[in-house]
Every structure is written in C-alpha cells, then in structure tokens.
Regions:
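Local cysteine-cluster metal-coordination motifs and their immediate loop/turn environment
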Residues: 1-12, 41-56, 128, 156-160, ...
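Helix-enriched interaction subdomains in cytosolic or periplasmic regions
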Residues: 37-59, 166-170, 179
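Non-heme iron-sulfur electron-transfer modules
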Residues: 12-42, 56-81
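Short, solvent-exposed loop/turn segments at the edges of secondary structure
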Residues: 23-25, 46-47, 232
Length: 265
C-alpha cells in the first residue's frame, strides 16, 4: 500500500535506515536499503517495522513447528521439554484473551504451559535476578579499577540493544557488561545445573523460551551461546504472538485453566 511506515520508523525513530524505496512509478516497492540483504543491513531486530505495518507485509520468523507440530518435540517426546517465560509475556497473553490481570496470574500461565505438554516450566525472573547480581558485581569491580575500563558501563541484557550498539557505535562496545541476558543465563542453567539435577544429558533436553522480542531468536543462535558443547543453550525462541496463536488453535478454555507453580531450578 506504499504507506512507508516501516521506512519512517526505522529511519526517523530507530535511526538505522534499514529500509528504503526501490524502483519508481507503479513498480515502487520497499526493500532493504543500498541493495543489501537483511543480514548485511545492520538490523537490530527490534521488530518496530513489523509492529508498524498495518497490513502484515512484514513478519517475524515463525518457530512453532519444531515445538508444536505433529513431529515437534511436545508430540514426539524425544527429549525432556523445558520452557522459560519472560515476565512481559504474563501481561501480553492476558491482553490477547482479554483476561483481567487478577485472573491471568503467573500460576495460570504455568498451568497452560503444562497443559500443552511441557515437562518443566520456569520463570525467567530467576535469571533476571542473576543478571542484576552479575552486572552489579561487574560494576563494583570496574569502580575499583576505573582507569582500566571505558565508561559508562552499559547493560547487555537486551540483544537488540547490543546489536544496535555494535553496528552504530562500535567504539563503545567495551562499555557493555559482559553478563549474558536473562534468557541465556536461564538456558545455561537448564543445560548445566538443572540437567545435572534431574540426571539428564544436556543433549536430551529441548529448551524453549517464550519472549516478547524477536531479537531473542537471533541471540539464541549465536555460536557463543553453547555452554555445554552439545548445542544451543536455548533451542527455540517463541514470541508472545506465536504462543498465543497456538493456544487459540488448541481451543483451550482459558477460564478453566488450573493454576500451577513454576518449577524451581
């Protein structure tokens, strides 16, 4: 429809200039700028172009198949399935089903995930606490040796922010904390400490993360996010929309969902 909203949000607000107008006249379309492909365009994967498109011409990668399809892990039970949920997802799933905040408790969300077939359900807030502790400890260490570090110190918990800084301000990369994001900390815990706790080989654990941001999909695929040497610490990332879509496809009676506790790592 040539509304150019994706171009405007990326250029004027995000300042990345990933999208641009291609061709002219009746053949005018939107494409990645400077003739590049999306992998070469320094995209931060913030998802704003997707959010602002009124006709869904842009969309994030759909990763439901390896989890929920007939040959997916929940149906074949080839591995122990573990899922972690970000705090922001609690509110978003409630809005999708028009549930009150009081009714859509974290425990009810945990109950929904167990109903779907996950063996273990974790709350990512545990790993968020670890991130705060790690970043806080690192900050104190830097304060003791100010002359050895570049300032200020930036958080590294958001992969979209990290990608943005690396592409737009490479001279400030050393300001980033060395701590992993909560998602990846939780993934490392699941494939290491928790695998040991339940006497399971990390290779036999299928780790799923439900997050509000599509940048998490790229983060989990980074080669550095393999703490066991057996594969990614987080195997699949689903965004809130994918999770809600699958819930709706199951025709789950959300008002009949039982409350259940999150597992303790």
């Amino acid at each position: 429809i040539k509304c150019m909203r994706c171009i405007q949000i990326c250029d004027k607000v995000q300042s990345l200039k990933v999208w641009d107008i291609a061709k002219t006249g009746s053949r005018t379309t939107v494409n990645v700028s400077l003739g590049r492909n999306i992998k070469e365009a320094d995209c931060a994967l913030c998802g704003q172009c997707i959010t602002h498109c009124p006709v869904a011409a842009l969309s994030g990668r759909d990763d439901k198949r390896p989890v929920f399809s007939q040959n997916g892990m929940l149906n074949t039970r080839r591995k122990t399935t573990v899922v972690q949920v970000a705090p922001a997802v609690r509110t978003a799933w409630a809005e999708a089903f028009r549930l009150s905040r009081k009714f859509a408790s974290p425990e009810r969300l945990a109950g929904a995930l167990r109903l779907m077939g996950f063996d273990y359900v974790f709350d990512t807030t545990y790993a968020a606490d670890l991130t705060i502790m790690e970043e806080g400890s690192e900050f104190l260490e830097r304060l003791k040796h100010k002359e050895d570090y570049q300032w200020p110190m930036f958080t590294s918990c958001c992969p979209g922010w990290v990608r943005f800084l690396k592409s737009q301000y490479p001279d400030m990369v050393d300001c980033l904390s060395t701590a992993k994001s909560p998602q990846q900390m939780q993934g490392a815990i699941i494939k290491n400490y928790f695998a040991d706790k339940i006497h399971e080989d990390p290779e036999n654990i299928f780790s799923v993360s439900i997050m509000p941001c599509i940048a998490k999909k790229a983060e989990c695929a980074l080669p550095t996010m393999d703490s066991t040497g057996t594969g990614p610490d987080v195997d699949v990332v689903l965004n809130t929309r994918e999770f809600v879509d699958y819930m709706k496809s199951l025709n789950i009676d959300v008002y009949g969902l039982p409350e259940d506790r999150f597992d303790s790592p």
